[in-house]
Amino acid sequence: MHHALEQVQKTGFICNNLLATVALPRIGKKQIKPLEDNELCAFLKEIRGDTYELVYFVIVFTGLRQGEVLGLTWDCVNFEKHTLLINKQHGKKKGTCEYCFSSLKNDRPRLIEAADGVMDALKKQQIRQQRWAARLKDGWENSDNLVFTTETGRYLCNQTVYLAFKKVMRRLHLDATRFHDLRHTYAVNSLKSGDDIKTVQENLGHQTAAFTLDVYAHATSSMKHESANRMDQYIHNVTKP
């Protein structure tokens, strides 16, 4: 609107652009709420045996977005090198009821090296899928080679997984926790474990390390405090009489 009135002003139809003096309200950042260690332990215990246990597990220990983990295909999983190629996502096409693959949020594929526990979870999922496929034979539907599917091989609906997650969180009395907070939990724990910001940025698929720093400023502030405490202890040790 501001730009449109500016163009009209140049033609002489109006003398002043009244919107030029209007200050837009600042949009506050959404506060991130990663799971605390005790909450994460309770969550992992609660999801044991859950239909989507391995989906949640992979997200919380890789930081993948929901669409990225639901769009992961077996050709992008390298068990020998312990790597995952994240090059697409899967979800509902905007304005339709159709589910399909689409490009990543930043349109930048990334290769991440996953922890042993994550690869073990994926191997477990592979074996489970093979068992389902053997039982259904010609009825198996996974033509897209998806890692996470229903027992018939169909894709998982984002909303179905989300609603199941919210039920878990309600049982844990953590109703305010959002699905995306699993990704935040991974990021904060990575930083607290000593991963450098560039590695965390690349694993998360952020455009820049500066963006990652901005989003997780509270975590890095905590790390600075811990660093100062370690230095204080070091000074104490080297200056002892």
Spans of model-derived segments:
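N-terminal DNA-binding recognition helix of tyrosine site-specific recombinases/integrases
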Residues: 1-20, 65
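C-terminal catalytic core of tyrosine-transesterase DNA break-rejoin enzymes
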Residues: 10, 57, 61-68, 159-160, ...
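DNA breakage-rejoining catalytic core of tyrosine-based enzymes
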Residues: 11-17, 26-45, 81, 87, ...
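Catalytic-site neighborhood detector that most strongly recognizes the C-terminal catalytic loop/helix
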Residues: 26-30, 34, 89-92, 119, ...
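DNA/chromatin major-groove-contacting recognition/catalytic segments
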Residues: 38, 42-48, 95-101, 193, ...
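Short, polar N-cap/turn motifs at the start of nucleic acid-interacting alpha helices
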Residues: 76-83, 175-176, 195-217, 225
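C-terminal secondary-structure termini that scaffold catalytic or DNA-interacting sites
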Residues: 81, 92-111, 116-118, 123-124, ...
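Active-site/catalytic core of tyrosine-dependent DNA strand-transfer enzymes
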Residues: 89, 115-175
